[in-house]
């Protein structure tokens, strides 16, 4: 898992008015919470947030905070980014403090490898779950979970229970959940062949 640094500033004032002023000044308001600590209000540069979540790990990147007084050298992951509905610019960020020796729960993207045999025969790929909910130590968070679909035939699916996860990583989704499958040929294609 990628680990990066992010400069922040703590702030004592909170509320909608303060948040609007921060955004007008080109900063993002946020909060750091978790691990039995009182929530701490922060602000940061949008560029710093974008750099911290860049790369394949995205929101699961481990971020070491810099310049935040008591929060200096604290390791966090992004819990949530609230975005403007139209511009998609960050409006607020929630950061969750982690302990490197305690397990965390995160969503990790699924990456499909190969082309399903059933798709080559005219079937339709049904990629039902693009991410999986896992539990592991922060240092073991994978960037993605790879699933080889080359042998997947029409009418078959790969379920959570059939996926092999890296050592120390446990999927907490229902084992019977289908992640990816191949559906039969489209009706008009089947009718044309008949």
Curated annotation (Swiss-Prot):
Membrane-spanning segments: none
GO molecular function (one): structural constituent of ribosome
GO cellular component, one term: cytosolic large ribosomal subunit
Domain of life per record: Bacteria
One of the protein's GO biological processes: translation
Keywords noted in UniProt: Ribonucleoprotein, Ribosomal protein, RNA-binding, rRNA-binding
Pfam families: Ribosomal_L25p (PF01386), Ribosomal_TL5_C (PF14693)
Family: Belongs to the bacterial ribosomal protein bL25 family. CTC subfamily.
Quaternary structure (record): Part of the 50S ribosomal subunit; part of the 5S rRNA/L5/L18/L25 subcomplex. Contacts the 5S rRNA. Binds to the 5S rRNA independently of L5 and L18.
Alphabetical list of NCBIfam families matching this protein: bL25_bact_ctc
PANTHER family: RIBOSOMAL PROTEIN L25/GLN-TRNA SYNTHETASE, ANTI-CODON-BINDING DOMAIN-CONTAINING PROTEIN, RIBOSOMAL PROTEIN L25_GLN-TRNA SYNTHETASE, ANTI-CODON-BINDING DOMAIN-CONTAINING PROTEIN
Function recorded in the entry: This is one of the proteins that binds to the 5S RNA in the ribosome where it forms part of the central protuberance.
Protein name stated in the entry: Large ribosomal subunit protein bL25
Protein source organism: Trichlorobacter lovleyi (strain ATCC BAA-1151 / DSM 17278 / SZ) (Geobacter lovleyi)
